[in-house]
């Protein structure tokens, strides 16, 4: 019998109920797995669990995007990497929606375990992995500054309230130099976004043509500071992808280096969590072929290589 460990965050979202874990366990067992559920108790616990457990055939993350980030982080610290999967139970669930999951945990388990294993690129910022997005500047502190109890009580509305507050505050520019695709550019930027996803902050089709296995990621550098320009840009994101919005400098690359002129006070946001690394220089690159079991639904549009990994 195959072995599976489910690492779940008991504080994620509204839908994860401890009294239903036995139902999820029985469902996973129907797919031929001997399964163990482990609940996280503190930030970083999921990473510790995955980095230290013995070999298993599958590790499932059951939580928000941040929980999946920790699972991936822990896996990259192992000598022998494991096959991972993600069942979304968070607030925004950008990764889960991108993968093709819905809102029902039971249905998502079925979609996952009847899916395919794909080799997926994972980005690293100063050797710290992020699954789908890292950002700095305007609006980028909202995900980690919004209190957890408000996220759980109000869901996505909690982020919108934080966004409204941030919108009304003064927009700061950061003096940075970045190197990308053989170019070296200096300027003042209000926010920067590095991603490998077609859904970010609840915006579907943030980019129209994204592949998760092409050894590239997308970069946006924004010079906007006026509120009217920010409103126009957000409006265009509803009808057009971010690569075609005026005032946003867009690149697709496999390597990026960003240097701040002065030490930034705020932290980067990686997959909705605060990046604890504080320095003036950040280097972003790819870690290739991390094995992820996911639903078949969106594989054809998310991956260049259509052959099964296993």
Residue ranges of each PLM-predicted region?
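Catalytic core of DAGKc-family lipid kinases
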Residues: 30-31, 38-40, 77-190, 194
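Nucleotide donor/acceptor-binding cores
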Residues: 1-4, 82, 254
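ATP/nucleoside-binding phosphotransfer catalytic cores, i.e., glycine-rich phosphate-binding loops
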Residues: 17, 180, 211, 221-310
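Glycine-rich phosphate/pyrophosphate-binding beta-alpha loops
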Residues: 135, 193-206, 274
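Gly/Ser/Thr-rich active-site loops/lids in small-molecule metabolic enzymes
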Residues: 150-158, 208-228
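ATP/NTP phosphate-donor binding region
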Residues: 1-62, 74, 107, 308-310
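Short Gly/Thr/Asp-enriched flexible loops that form oxyanion-binding sites at enzyme active sites
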Residues: 67-79
């Amino acid at each position: 019998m195959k072995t599976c460990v489910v690492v779940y965050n008991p504080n994620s979202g509204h839908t994860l109920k401890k009294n239903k874990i036995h139902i999820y366990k029985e469902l996973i067992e129907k797919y031929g797995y001997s399964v163990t559920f482990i609940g996280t108790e503190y930030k970083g616990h999921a990473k510790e669990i995955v980095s230290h457990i013995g070999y298993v055939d599958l590790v499932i993350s059951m939580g928000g995007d941040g929980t999946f980030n920790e699972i991936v982080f822990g896996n990259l610290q192992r000598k022998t990497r494991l096959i991972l999967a993600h069942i979304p139970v968070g607030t925004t669930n950008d990764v889960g929606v991108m993968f093709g999951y819905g809102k029902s945990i039971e249905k998502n388990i079925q979609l996952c375990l009847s899916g395919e294993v794909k080799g997926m690129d994972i980005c690293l910022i100063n050797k710290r992995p992020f699954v789908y997005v890292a950002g700095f500047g305007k609006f980028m502190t909202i995900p980690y500054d919004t209190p957890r109890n408000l996220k759980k009580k109000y869901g996505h509305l909690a982020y919108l309230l934080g966004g409204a507050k941030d919108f009304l505050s003064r927009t700061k520019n950061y003096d940075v130099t970045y190197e990308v695709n053989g170019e070296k550019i200096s300027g003042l930027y209000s926010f920067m976004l590095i991603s490998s996803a077609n859904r970010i902050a609840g915006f579907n089709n943030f980019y129209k043509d994204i592949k998760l296995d092409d050894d590239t990621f997308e970069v946006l550098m924004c010079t906007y500071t006026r509120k009217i320009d920010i409103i126009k840009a957000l409006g265009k994101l509803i009808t057009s992808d971010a690569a075609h919005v005026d005032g946003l400098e867009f690149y697709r690359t496999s390597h990026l280096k960003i240097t701040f002129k002065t030490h930034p006070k705020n932290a980067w946001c990686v997959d909705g969590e605060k990046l604890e690394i504080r320095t003036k220089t950040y280097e972003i690159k790819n870690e290739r072929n991390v094995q992820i079991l996911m639903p078949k639904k969106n594989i054809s549009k998310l991956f260049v290589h259509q052959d099964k990994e296993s």
